[in-house]
Amino acid sequence: MIYQGNRITVSLLDDGIANMQFNAEGESVNKFDAETNKQFDEAVSALEKADNVKGLIVTSSKGVFIAGADITEFVSHFNKEAAEIEKWIVDINGVFNRFEDLPFPKVAAINGAALGGGCEMTLVCEYRVMGDKAQIGLPETQLGIFPGFGGSVRTPRVIGIDNAVELIATGKAQKPAEALKLGLVDAVVAQDDLQEAAVDLVKKCIAGDLDWQAKREEKLQPVKLNQLEQTMAFSTAKAAIFAKANPKQYPAPAIAIETIEKHVNLGRDEAIKVEAAGFAKAAKTPQAESLVGLFLNDQTVKKLAKQHTKNAHDINEAAVLGAGIMGGGIAYQAASKGLPIIMKDIKSEQLDLGMGEASKLLGKMVERKKMTPAQMGETLSRIRPTLNYGDFGETDIVIEAVVENPKVKHAVLKEVEGLVKDNAILASNTSTISITYLATVLERPENFVGMHFFNPVHRMPLVEVIRGEKSSEEAIATTVALAQRMGKVPVVVNDCPGFLVNRVLFPYFGAFDLLLKQGADFVHVDKVMEKFGWPMGPAYLIDVVGLDTGVHGAEVMAEGFPDRMKPDYKGAIKHLFENNRLGQKNGVGFYKYEKDSRGKPKKTADDATYALLKDTTDTDNQQFDDQTIIDRMMLAFCNETVRCLEDNIVATPSEADMAMIMGVGFPAFRGGPCRYIDQVGLDNYLALCEKYAHLGKAYEAPQKIRDMAAAGETFYPKA
């Protein structure tokens, strides 16, 4: 044994070939945390002293090769000064460079995901062999940073500038065939043959059949392109990348490209220093703080959901009441994940609509070659459309997705409860109606919960699981488990009108209505909020949701929270609805919609809208600058999020932030409403609340904000 650690071992195989194996004891995956970095340094030192090693393979004992750096440890470094971050990165790179400089050939045997630091570990080897089930990539820009362990230096020298820029700037993981085509790996073999193939490559290097030293030398020298070729490569890459991501919102890809451009004409050691400076620059951006925080929040939400499933019942068959687009979407989602589901409606045309929706979604999967026609048929066969309850006796969970009317829901829920087994779970897909209220007609309210999917079901990852006053932990656990099985991210919330997401969204629409009443232009407001980072502005969003849905939801919310959600005037949204402008569903809302050449609705501002809005606009129109619009819209949204934490509707800032990003498209690079408040600063945020408090209760600072500001606290403590 050349080196023995609890993260890394280096053993000698036959013929002078060593095996550096990453094997983090007690961990499900290998990653570059502080202890692994320490042992990597020690292992390299041992190899530098070994005189009996002729070549080396790098392997993993886990299903994952190396998942990358430990993000939880990264956060503590990001709060340091840029110079300290640079030094930390340069020091780690010193070990990677020493490994690369070892006087014998090295081959990485990539058996699973080699991401971030894992990919960078393979790049310090001369050759890379990849298993046919593995993946490789540099996803750091998705966290607001970019590769810091030499990845931005070595990839342009291995796969070319244009390919390297795309790999790093998009953060997309590569499948084996893609990686081979790029030149990121040298061979793809069956998983079972991986170590043998890696050893064979090392033997060829030792025998002189492969010039491994030339391969290494390429990575140590500047990129071999003249200035004109470099300029063309970078110009093309920048145009492609910036068309996909706004560098003001997501600066990491731009910083990565700028950094690569600075170091491509340098040797490795100098280039590494440039990379470290670029990494520190990206790490100090608020977007990096937000996106790394988002990654950690995602882990937190998944852990909490897993804890909720401890008492879950087995689910062998589900049912959905109400077909149509929503029911069809729920049925599709269940069936596509292998779960048999009954879809019941009282009208055959609704069943046809539901099956049509499922068929359409599956057809698109076939078109994209993500599914074969045979698999599509098999998936569709898991959905059983029916007009009666004959098959409900053995169903484990029934999702009610009928019209958003409490009387109809009461009737349907009461009826189905008498037809299912005693321990079957009933879940309502209501978006606003109290679960506790809906449970009043049930004999077994403990088996009843809310399960709020977002539209379109196949695209929106969030499911709110709502706990009513009498909902049992088993019912919550089973519903959370079902959401996970359907490929969704469940967040458990307590019952109130609108639950979490809609309760927060409606004050945002209220703030929009008030701005329009006071003279703001809806097109201008949309542009400002889209520039802020929302995928669509509030006018466009309510058009997509449907003004009828919005008005109905607003009435429910006004009844639940009259102090801040019941306006004393008729707003633009209600006025347009009363004039039969429903949004995209009938072609006219705030905007007018016409189909483009691909059949997609295209919006244009409509003179008829402006004419109608004169009826709801104050005579003394005000002009609003962009920051005022942002402040007023975001205060209403963020204040209600904080009130949901105060009222224990949602348990943690992590869950609140993830729900808003996944449920309504809160700008991911801002990290969620709680992270946004932290970045504005609690004192500054409180001052904004006081500035706009005269507009109404929705703008007044929640007590939690006052208390936190007084105590100098934040939602996310600084590491």
UniProtKB/Swiss-Prot annotation:
InterPro entries: 3-OHacyl-CoA_DH_CS, 3-OHacyl-CoA_DH_NAD-bd, 3HC_DH_C, 6-PGluconate_DH-like_C_sf, ClpP/crotonase-like_dom_sf, Enoyl-CoA_hydra/iso, FA_oxidation_alpha_subunit, FadB. GO terms for biological process: fatty acid beta-oxidation. In the N-terminal section; belongs to the enoyl-CoA hydratase/isomerase family. In the C-terminal section; belongs to the 3-hydroxyacyl-CoA dehydrogenase family. The active site is at H452 (for 3-hydroxyacyl-coa dehydrogenase activity). Residues 1-190 are annotated as: Enoyl-CoA hydratase/isomerase. This is Fatty acid oxidation complex subunit alpha. One of its GO terms (molecular function) is enoyl-CoA hydratase activity. Keywords: Fatty acid metabolism, Isomerase, Lipid degradation, Lipid metabolism, Lyase, Multifunctional enzyme, NAD, Oxidoreductase. It catalyses: a (3S)-3-hydroxyacyl-CoA + NAD(+) = a 3-oxoacyl-CoA + NADH + H(+); a (3S)-3-hydroxyacyl-CoA = a (2E)-enoyl-CoA + H2O; a 4-saturated-(3S)-3-hydroxyacyl-CoA = a (3E)-enoyl-CoA + H2O; (3S)-3-hydroxybutanoyl-CoA = (3R)-3-hydroxybutanoyl-CoA. HAMAP family: FadB. Heterotetramer of two alpha chains (FadB) and two beta chains (FadA). Its EC number is 4.2.1.17, 5.1.2.3, 5.3.3.8, 1.1.1.35. Pathway: Lipid metabolism; fatty acid beta-oxidation. The keyword Transmembrane does not apply. Disulfide bonds: none annotated. NAD(+) binds at M326, D345, V402, V403, E404, K409, S431, N455. The record marks E120, E140 as: Important for catalytic activity. PANTHER family: TRIFUNCTIONAL ENZYME SUBUNIT ALPHA, TRIFUNCTIONAL ENZYME SUBUNIT ALPHA, MITOCHONDRIAL. GO terms for cellular component: fatty acid beta-oxidation multienzyme complex. Involved in the aerobic and anaerobic degradation of long-chain fatty acids via beta-oxidation cycle. Catalyzes the formation of 3-oxoacyl-CoA from enoyl-CoA via L-3-hydroxyacyl-CoA. It can also use D-3-hydroxyacyl-CoA and cis-3-enoyl-CoA as substrate. The keyword Transferase does not apply. Residues 313-719 are annotated as: 3-hydroxyacyl-CoA dehydrogenase. Substrate binds at D298, N502.
